[in-house]
Design a protein with these regions (language model features):
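Low-complexity, intrinsically disordered or signal/transmembrane-proximal segments
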Residues: 2-4, 11
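Helical "substrate-binding/catalytic lid" subdomain
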Residues: 162, 166-168, 176, 183, ...
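Rossmann-fold NAD(P)-binding glycine/threonine-rich loop
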Residues: 121, 125-174
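General beta-strand structural signal in soluble alpha/beta enzymes
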Residues: 78-79, 124, 146-150, 190-192, ...
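NAD(P)+-binding Rossmann beta1-loop-alpha1 motif at the extreme N-terminus of oxidoreductases
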Residues: 11-93, 119, 156-159
């Protein structure tokens, strides 16, 4: 498939200011690379291309990349190596990395730093540690490459619901990727507008936010995950109590290894825990997608 090179794409242009300093100015990026086509990576590509943007995709399993490209051949191109991003993406290149955090991400980012050129963009959308982002940003900057970290929440349900995006990096670069963020995020329709808000719809209301400089996106995602795990732990503890609220109905052996139940008459409830969670999902203050 041939990329539509004549369409408007996002790229950086060098502009010489009156003080003699050369800076980069940006237009909106409409072509993006994606490395890692697991359930989230592939669904991100589907949302991006359903919005009319273009994607160049790579996965270590070449058949996965070819299969995804076959779903939308006018907007998705499969390549067989990371080095091909240098020629497959037009204008300013932006490549989104969606692989497991740690050594795999480290290896991919290093290869991209040797593949891309000044003013290109590396996007880490995995669950990397924010302090690693700081180092990746510094390393990329030595080659003039921009680094953007994106805490991506939405899981396998994001294809239909959209993805919440917590973003760190230079403001101008993040803004240049607005079309991509808007394609991926849930959109303003995902939730009622918060009381007190008025005027133009903000990016946060669309489901994405520039949280700050390098590392800010993954820092916010780290806290998000901590809250998520805390919620799941609270649910688990509470539901376990409900499940075992019938202990007073069970025979208990009196021995050194069995704690006595002081008032068995207080614990004689046979709760339908699944049904309780169903009602909690409907109007309860503890209602949550996690339920």
């Amino acid at each position: 498939m041939q990329l539509h090179l004549k369409e408007k794409v996002l790229y950086a242009k060098n502009t010489v200011m009156s003080n003699g300093v050369t800076v980069a100015t940006y237009e909106n990026i409409t072509h993006i690379g994606m490395i890692g086509l697991g359930r989230m990576g592939a669904n991100l590509v589907r949302r991006i291309t359903r919005a009319g943007l273009h994607a160049v995709v790579y996965d270590t399993n070449a058949e996965v990349a070819k299969s995804l490209a076959a779903e939308n051949p006018d907007h998705i191109t499969a390549i067989s190596s990371i080095s091909e991003f240098a020629t497959a993406l037009p204008g300013q290149r932006a490549v989104w990395v969606m692989v497991p955090a740690g050594t795999i991400t480290e290896s991919v980012i290093t290869e991209l730093q040797h593949t891309l050129s000044a003013n290109d963009i590396i996007i880490d959308g995995g669950n990397s540690y924010y302090r690693d982002d700081l180092e990746h940003s510094k390393q990329s900057a030595t080659k003039g490459i921009h680094f953007v970290d994106v805490g991506t929440s939405g899981g396998v349900w994001g294809l239909e619901r959209g993805y919440c995006l917590m973003i760190g990096g230079d403001a101008e670069v993040v803004t240049a990727l607005s079309d991509v963020w808007n394609a991926v995020a849930p959109g303003v329709e995902a939730a009622p507008r918060s009381p007190g808000l008025s005027g133009d719809i903000t990016p946060a209301e669309r489901g994405w936010l520039h949280c700050g400089p390098s590392g800010a996106g993954h820092f916010v995602k780290m806290i998000h995950n901590g809250i998520e795990y805390g919620l799941m732990a609270a649910y688990a503890e509470g539901l376990n109590i409900l499940k075992n609220a019938n202990e007073g109905l069970k025979p208990r052996t009196a021995d050194a290894e069995t704690a006595p139940l002081a008032h068995p008459e207080h614990y004689q409830y046979e709760f339908d825990v699944a049904a309780i969670t169903e009602i909690w999902r409907r109007g309860s203050v503890v209602a949550s997608w996690l339920l």
